[in-house]
Protein backbone atom coordinates (compact mmCIF):
# COMPACT_ATOMS: atom_id res chain seq x y z
CA UNK A 1 0.00 0.00 0.00
CA UNK A 2 1.25 3.51 -0.84
CA UNK A 3 0.21 6.41 1.37
CA UNK A 4 -0.59 9.91 0.20
CA UNK A 5 3.00 10.81 1.02
CA UNK A 6 4.37 8.04 -1.15
CA UNK A 7 5.36 5.86 1.79
CA UNK A 8 4.86 2.15 1.20
CA UNK A 9 3.69 -0.04 4.07
CA UNK A 10 2.51 -3.59 4.59
CA UNK A 11 -1.25 -4.17 4.54
CA UNK A 12 -1.43 -5.18 8.21
CA UNK A 13 0.63 -2.20 9.29
CA UNK A 14 -1.54 0.17 7.29
CA UNK A 15 -4.79 -1.25 8.68
CA UNK A 16 -3.57 -0.85 12.24
CA UNK A 17 -2.27 2.64 11.54
CA UNK A 18 -5.76 3.52 10.32
CA UNK A 19 -7.11 2.36 13.68
CA UNK A 20 -9.42 -0.25 12.16
CA UNK A 21 -8.40 -3.14 14.39
CA UNK A 22 -6.58 -4.19 17.53
CA UNK A 23 -3.73 -6.63 17.02
CA UNK A 24 -1.59 -8.81 19.23
CA UNK A 25 0.38 -10.37 16.36
CA UNK A 26 2.71 -7.50 15.51
CA UNK A 27 6.04 -8.39 13.93
CA UNK A 28 9.39 -6.70 14.44
CA UNK A 29 9.47 -5.67 10.78
CA UNK A 30 6.06 -4.01 10.99
CA UNK A 31 6.93 -2.12 14.16
CA UNK A 32 10.25 -0.96 12.73
CA UNK A 33 8.55 0.22 9.53
CA UNK A 34 6.19 2.39 11.57
CA UNK A 35 8.98 3.76 13.75
CA UNK A 36 11.02 4.71 10.67
CA UNK A 37 8.20 6.58 8.90
CA UNK A 38 8.92 10.21 8.00
CA UNK A 39 8.23 12.14 11.18
CA UNK A 40 5.22 14.12 9.86
CA UNK A 41 3.59 10.91 8.60
CA UNK A 42 4.25 9.08 11.88
CA UNK A 43 2.77 11.92 13.91
CA UNK A 44 -0.27 12.17 11.64
CA UNK A 45 -1.00 8.46 11.96
CA UNK A 46 -0.46 8.38 15.71
CA UNK A 47 -2.69 11.41 16.31
CA UNK A 48 -5.36 10.00 13.98
CA UNK A 49 -5.45 6.70 15.87
CA UNK A 50 -5.39 8.54 19.18
CA UNK A 51 -8.47 10.58 18.22
CA UNK A 52 -10.39 7.43 17.31
CA UNK A 53 -10.11 6.17 20.87
CA UNK A 54 -9.51 9.15 23.16
CA UNK A 55 -10.31 12.80 23.61
CA UNK A 56 -7.08 14.45 22.36
CA UNK A 57 -7.51 17.39 24.75
CA UNK A 58 -7.66 15.19 27.86
CA UNK A 59 -4.73 13.84 29.88
CA UNK A 60 -4.94 11.59 32.94
CA UNK A 61 -3.13 12.88 36.03
CA UNK A 62 -1.80 10.42 38.59
CA UNK A 63 0.32 10.78 41.72
CA UNK A 64 2.97 8.26 42.77
CA UNK A 65 4.00 7.77 46.40
CA UNK A 66 6.83 5.58 47.70
CA UNK A 67 5.22 3.79 50.65
CA UNK A 68 8.34 1.73 51.38
CA UNK A 69 11.66 3.08 50.12
CA UNK A 70 15.01 1.34 49.54
CA UNK A 71 16.52 -1.92 50.71
CA UNK A 72 15.18 -3.89 47.74
CA UNK A 73 16.73 -7.33 47.17
CA UNK A 74 16.65 -6.95 43.38
CA UNK A 75 19.77 -5.66 41.58
CA UNK A 76 18.10 -3.52 38.89
CA UNK A 77 20.98 -1.53 37.44
CA UNK A 78 18.92 1.62 36.98
CA UNK A 79 17.38 1.82 40.45
CA UNK A 80 18.43 3.87 43.47
CA UNK A 81 16.42 1.60 45.78
CA UNK A 82 18.44 -1.58 45.26
CA UNK A 83 20.34 -2.83 48.31
CA UNK A 84 23.09 -3.89 45.89
CA UNK A 85 24.05 -0.29 45.03
CA UNK A 86 25.63 2.54 47.02
CA UNK A 87 23.37 5.43 46.11
CA UNK A 88 23.12 7.09 49.50
CA UNK A 89 19.42 6.33 49.76
CA UNK A 90 18.23 5.48 53.26
CA UNK A 91 15.86 2.52 53.49
CA UNK A 92 12.56 3.06 55.27
CA UNK A 93 9.85 0.85 56.72
CA UNK A 94 6.36 0.60 55.27
CA UNK A 95 4.41 3.79 55.86
CA UNK A 96 1.37 3.73 58.10
CA UNK A 97 -2.08 3.52 56.55
CA UNK A 98 -3.27 6.90 57.83
CA UNK A 99 -0.11 8.64 56.61
CA UNK A 100 -0.59 7.20 53.14
CA UNK A 101 -4.26 8.20 53.05
CA UNK A 102 -3.32 11.72 54.10
CA UNK A 103 -0.98 11.89 51.10
CA UNK A 104 -3.72 10.49 48.87
CA UNK A 105 -6.08 13.25 49.98
CA UNK A 106 -3.44 15.85 49.16
CA UNK A 107 -3.02 14.27 45.74
CA UNK A 108 -6.77 14.44 45.12
CA UNK A 109 -6.87 18.05 46.27
CA UNK A 110 -4.07 18.75 43.79
CA UNK A 111 -6.10 17.35 40.91
CA UNK A 112 -4.89 13.74 40.72
CA UNK A 113 -7.41 11.14 39.61
CA UNK A 114 -5.26 8.06 40.23
CA UNK A 115 -3.10 7.37 43.29
CA UNK A 116 -0.21 4.96 42.82
CA UNK A 117 1.68 3.39 45.72
CA UNK A 118 5.12 1.83 45.28
CA UNK A 119 6.99 -0.44 47.68
CA UNK A 120 10.61 -1.48 47.10
CA UNK A 121 10.14 -5.23 47.53
CA UNK A 122 11.10 -8.25 45.47
CA UNK A 123 7.69 -9.53 46.54
CA UNK A 124 5.42 -8.53 49.45
CA UNK A 125 5.09 -10.47 52.69
CA UNK A 126 1.55 -11.44 53.58
CA UNK A 127 1.68 -9.42 56.82
CA UNK A 128 2.53 -6.29 54.85
CA UNK A 129 -0.23 -6.97 52.36
CA UNK A 130 -2.84 -6.43 55.08
CA UNK A 131 -1.73 -2.81 55.42
CA UNK A 132 -1.50 -2.31 51.66
CA UNK A 133 -5.05 -3.61 51.20
CA UNK A 134 -6.26 -1.12 53.82
CA UNK A 135 -4.49 1.65 51.89
CA UNK A 136 -6.18 0.56 48.66
CA UNK A 137 -9.63 0.52 50.26
CA UNK A 138 -9.05 3.97 51.73
CA UNK A 139 -7.89 5.42 48.42
CA UNK A 140 -10.93 3.98 46.66
CA UNK A 141 -13.22 5.49 49.30
CA UNK A 142 -11.89 8.93 48.29
CA UNK A 143 -13.06 8.42 44.72
CA UNK A 144 -9.56 7.91 43.36
CA UNK A 145 -8.36 5.06 41.19
CA UNK A 146 -5.86 2.88 43.06
CA UNK A 147 -2.64 1.42 41.66
CA UNK A 148 0.18 -0.37 43.46
CA UNK A 149 3.58 -1.75 42.51
CA UNK A 150 4.90 -4.30 44.99
CA UNK A 151 7.07 -6.68 42.98
CA UNK A 152 6.22 -10.26 42.10
CA UNK A 153 2.91 -11.68 43.33
CA UNK A 154 1.40 -15.06 44.04
CA UNK A 155 -2.13 -15.80 42.74
CA UNK A 156 -3.45 -15.59 46.32
CA UNK A 157 -1.94 -12.15 46.76
CA UNK A 158 -3.54 -11.03 43.50
CA UNK A 159 -6.90 -12.21 44.82
CA UNK A 160 -6.46 -10.22 48.02
CA UNK A 161 -5.52 -7.05 46.17
CA UNK A 162 -8.51 -7.44 43.88
CA UNK A 163 -10.84 -7.90 46.84
CA UNK A 164 -9.52 -4.64 48.31
CA UNK A 165 -10.64 -2.86 45.14
CA UNK A 166 -7.33 -2.43 43.30
CA UNK A 167 -7.79 -0.94 39.82
CA UNK A 168 -4.28 -1.28 38.37
CA UNK A 169 -1.15 -3.26 39.16
CA UNK A 170 2.11 -1.77 37.91
CA UNK A 171 4.83 -4.24 36.96
CA UNK A 172 7.17 -2.87 34.30
CA UNK A 173 9.07 -5.16 31.95
CA UNK A 174 11.90 -2.58 31.98
CA UNK A 175 13.48 -3.23 28.57
CA UNK A 176 13.73 -5.75 25.74
CA UNK A 177 14.19 -9.49 26.37
CA UNK A 178 17.66 -9.34 24.78
CA UNK A 179 18.88 -6.39 26.87
CA UNK A 180 17.22 -7.52 30.09
CA UNK A 181 20.20 -9.54 31.46
CA UNK A 182 22.37 -6.43 31.08
CA UNK A 183 20.11 -4.56 33.52
CA UNK A 184 18.80 -7.16 35.99
CA UNK A 185 20.24 -10.52 37.11
CA UNK A 186 18.11 -11.34 40.17
CA UNK A 187 15.02 -12.04 38.08
CA UNK A 188 14.14 -12.77 34.45
CA UNK A 189 11.77 -11.28 31.92
CA UNK A 190 9.69 -14.45 32.26
CA UNK A 191 9.31 -13.76 35.99
CA UNK A 192 7.81 -10.39 35.10
CA UNK A 193 5.49 -11.85 32.50
CA UNK A 194 4.32 -14.57 34.90
CA UNK A 195 3.24 -11.94 37.43
CA UNK A 196 1.48 -9.97 34.70
CA UNK A 197 -0.40 -13.12 33.69
CA UNK A 198 -1.45 -13.73 37.30
CA UNK A 199 -2.66 -10.15 37.67
CA UNK A 200 -4.64 -10.37 34.43
CA UNK A 201 -6.16 -13.70 35.49
CA UNK A 202 -7.22 -12.07 38.75
CA UNK A 203 -9.23 -9.42 36.93
CA UNK A 204 -6.95 -6.46 37.75
CA UNK A 205 -5.95 -4.06 34.99
CA UNK A 206 -2.31 -3.99 33.91
CA UNK A 207 0.01 -1.01 34.10
CA UNK A 208 3.26 -2.09 32.49
CA UNK A 209 5.87 -0.34 30.42
CA UNK A 210 9.59 0.25 30.47
CA UNK A 211 12.57 2.56 30.63
CA UNK A 212 14.67 4.01 27.82
CA UNK A 213 18.06 5.66 27.95
CA UNK A 214 19.95 2.90 29.78
CA UNK A 215 22.33 2.08 26.93
CA UNK A 216 19.90 -0.03 24.95
CA UNK A 217 19.59 0.19 21.15
CA UNK A 218 16.66 1.48 19.12
CA UNK A 219 15.88 -2.15 18.29
CA UNK A 220 15.70 -2.88 22.03
CA UNK A 221 13.23 -0.04 22.55
CA UNK A 222 11.02 -1.31 19.76
CA UNK A 223 11.30 -4.89 21.05
CA UNK A 224 10.19 -3.74 24.51
CA UNK A 225 7.02 -2.26 23.04
CA UNK A 226 6.47 -5.41 20.99
CA UNK A 227 6.43 -7.54 24.16
CA UNK A 228 3.60 -5.36 25.46
CA UNK A 229 1.78 -5.08 22.13
CA UNK A 230 1.72 -8.87 21.70
CA UNK A 231 -0.01 -9.40 25.03
CA UNK A 232 -3.66 -10.30 24.48
CA UNK A 233 -5.39 -8.16 25.54
CA UNK A 234 -3.05 -5.18 25.58
CA UNK A 235 -2.13 -3.57 28.91
CA UNK A 236 -4.62 -0.91 29.90
CA UNK A 237 -1.83 1.47 30.91
CA UNK A 238 1.67 1.75 29.39
CA UNK A 239 4.18 4.02 31.18
CA UNK A 240 7.23 5.08 29.16
CA UNK A 241 10.10 6.30 31.35
CA UNK A 242 13.21 8.24 30.38
CA UNK A 243 15.95 7.08 32.75
CA UNK A 244 16.96 9.62 35.39
CA UNK A 245 20.70 9.61 36.04
CA UNK A 246 21.35 8.28 39.55
CA UNK A 247 24.86 8.27 41.03
CA UNK A 248 25.93 4.88 42.36
CA UNK A 249 23.83 2.79 39.97
CA UNK A 250 25.55 0.50 37.43
CA UNK A 251 23.74 2.21 34.56
CA UNK A 252 25.30 5.56 35.46
CA UNK A 253 27.94 6.38 32.89
CA UNK A 254 26.56 3.85 30.39
CA UNK A 255 23.35 5.66 29.56
CA UNK A 256 22.64 6.63 25.98
CA UNK A 257 19.43 8.62 26.06
CA UNK A 258 17.35 8.99 22.91
CA UNK A 259 17.15 12.51 21.55
CA UNK A 260 13.74 14.24 21.79
CA UNK A 261 12.62 13.22 18.29
CA UNK A 262 13.59 9.58 18.87
CA UNK A 263 11.67 9.58 22.16
CA UNK A 264 8.59 11.08 20.53
CA UNK A 265 8.82 8.40 17.83
CA UNK A 266 8.65 5.78 20.57
CA UNK A 267 5.54 7.37 22.08
CA UNK A 268 3.91 7.43 18.64
CA UNK A 269 4.81 3.78 18.08
CA UNK A 270 3.26 2.82 21.42
CA UNK A 271 0.06 4.57 20.39
CA UNK A 272 -0.06 2.82 17.02
CA UNK A 273 0.70 -0.63 18.42
CA UNK A 274 -1.72 -0.30 21.36
CA UNK A 275 -4.49 2.07 20.21
CA UNK A 276 -6.73 1.75 23.27
CA UNK A 277 -4.06 1.77 25.99
CA UNK A 278 -3.34 4.75 28.20
CA UNK A 279 0.22 5.84 27.30
CA UNK A 280 1.86 7.56 30.25
CA UNK A 281 4.66 10.07 29.84
CA UNK A 282 6.32 8.97 33.05
CA UNK A 283 9.74 9.49 34.69
CA UNK A 284 12.16 11.92 33.10
CA UNK A 285 9.70 14.73 32.38
CA UNK A 286 11.64 17.04 34.67
CA UNK A 287 14.37 17.21 32.00
CA UNK A 288 11.96 17.58 29.07
CA UNK A 289 11.10 20.92 27.53
CA UNK A 290 7.48 22.01 27.21
CA UNK A 291 7.83 21.59 23.45
CA UNK A 292 9.03 17.99 23.80
CA UNK A 293 6.13 17.15 26.11
CA UNK A 294 3.69 18.81 23.71
CA UNK A 295 4.99 16.60 20.89
CA UNK A 296 4.55 13.55 23.13
CA UNK A 297 0.91 14.48 23.75
CA UNK A 298 0.44 14.98 20.01
CA UNK A 299 1.98 11.53 19.44
CA UNK A 300 -0.58 9.92 21.74
CA UNK A 301 0.66 10.22 25.33
CA UNK A 302 -2.37 10.86 27.52
CA UNK A 303 -1.24 10.41 31.11
CA UNK A 304 1.35 11.97 33.40
CA UNK A 305 2.44 11.79 37.02
CA UNK A 306 1.89 15.01 38.95
CA UNK A 307 3.75 16.09 42.06
CA UNK A 308 7.37 17.12 42.49
CA UNK A 309 8.74 13.63 43.34
CA UNK A 310 8.43 10.22 41.63
CA UNK A 311 9.50 7.63 44.20
CA UNK A 312 13.07 8.99 44.59
CA UNK A 313 13.52 11.23 41.53
CA UNK A 314 12.41 14.73 40.55
CA UNK A 315 9.23 15.54 38.65
CA UNK A 316 7.78 18.86 37.42
CA UNK A 317 5.83 20.79 40.04
CA UNK A 318 2.03 20.80 39.78
CA UNK A 319 1.92 24.52 38.99
CA UNK A 320 4.30 24.00 36.07
CA UNK A 321 2.13 21.19 34.71
CA UNK A 322 -1.00 23.31 35.13
CA UNK A 323 0.64 26.13 33.19
CA UNK A 324 1.64 23.74 30.39
CA UNK A 325 -1.89 22.31 30.21
CA UNK A 326 -3.30 25.84 29.99
CA UNK A 327 -0.93 26.76 27.16
CA UNK A 328 -1.86 23.62 25.23
CA UNK A 329 -5.60 23.74 25.94
CA UNK A 330 -5.42 20.39 27.74
CA UNK A 331 -7.57 19.43 30.72
CA UNK A 332 -7.22 16.70 33.33
CA UNK A 333 -9.22 13.51 32.80
CA UNK A 334 -12.07 12.25 34.93
CA UNK A 335 -11.11 9.53 37.48
CA UNK A 336 -12.13 6.48 35.45
CA UNK A 337 -9.97 5.64 32.44
CA UNK A 338 -13.13 4.83 30.50
CA UNK A 339 -14.18 8.48 30.83
CA UNK A 340 -11.27 9.35 28.54
CA UNK A 341 -12.81 7.45 25.62
CA UNK A 342 -14.13 9.72 22.95
CA UNK A 343 -17.86 9.97 22.41
CA UNK A 344 -17.40 8.24 19.07
CA UNK A 345 -15.76 5.16 20.63
From Swiss-Prot:
One of its GO terms (molecular function) is 2 iron, 2 sulfur cluster binding. InterPro entries: Aldolase_TIM, BATS_dom, Biotin_synth/BioAB, Biotin_synthase, Elp3/MiaA/NifB-like_rSAM, rSAM. One of its GO terms (biological process) is biotin biosynthetic process. Its EC number is 2.8.1.6. Pathway: Cofactor biosynthesis; biotin biosynthesis; biotin from 7,8-diaminononanoate: step 2/2. [2Fe-2S] cluster binds at residues 116, 147, 207, 280. [4Fe-4S] cluster binds at residues 72, 76, 79. Binds 1 [4Fe-4S] cluster. The cluster is coordinated with 3 cysteines and an exchangeable S-adenosyl-L-methionine. Pfam families: BATS, Radical_SAM. Residues 57-285 form the Radical SAM core domain. Keywords: 2Fe-2S, 4Fe-4S, Biotin biosynthesis, Iron, Iron-sulfur, Metal-binding, S-adenosyl-L-methionine, Transferase. Its cofactor is [4Fe-4S] cluster; [2Fe-2S] cluster. It is an enzyme of class 2 (transferase). It catalyses: (4R,5S)-dethiobiotin + (sulfur carrier)-SH + 2 reduced [2Fe-2S]-[ferredoxin] + 2 S-adenosyl-L-methionine = (sulfur carrier)-H + biotin + 2 5'-deoxyadenosine + 2 L-methionine + 2 oxidized [2Fe-2S]-[ferredoxin]. It comes from the Bacteria. Belongs to the radical SAM superfamily. Biotin synthase family. PANTHER family: BIOTIN SYNTHASE, BIOTIN SYNTHASE, MITOCHONDRIAL. Homodimer. Catalyzes the conversion of dethiobiotin (DTB) to biotin by the insertion of a sulfur atom into dethiobiotin via a radical-based mechanism. This is Biotin synthase. The lineage of its organism: Bacteria, Pseudomonadati, Pseudomonadota, Alphaproteobacteria, Hyphomicrobiales.
